[in-house]
């Protein structure tokens, strides 16, 4: 594992989630007012507003009907791939890597990017603050895919490491 230093600007969060429930927004304000440091061993991962938008759009397109946890797990896959030696080390490159996310090729991503829910943004911020699962690298809908070792099913998605 690597050390991840994240700086999340409060203004970016509030801009992205202006209609979020006040209690959640208040909690996030407290959690993002200063530098967030996640201890994992060795490098800094700079997360831009564009990265956050991309991850939220993927979460929306791939797990729009899977609830907050389903979206968080999709974001985990992206972040875990960034950390993996087997995938590109940047969020945008992971997302646009050929044949990885169905929504990129079927038009779902383009539809989602203009209509990202507050819940999808919350999933991204929650995972940046505290990952749900550090091991999952793949997911498919309907059954376990041909890649990776099956780990578990969450609603309609099957996750592998």
Where are these regions (language model features)?
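Bacterial extracytoplasmic/cell-wall-associated proteins, especially those involved in peptidoglycan
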Residues: 29-161
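Sec-dependent N-terminal signal peptides of Gram-positive bacterial secreted proteins and lipoproteins
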Residues: 2-22
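Low-complexity, intrinsically disordered regions enriched in charged/polar residues
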Residues: 1, 23-27, 49
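Sec-dependent signal peptide cleavage junction
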Residues: 16-34
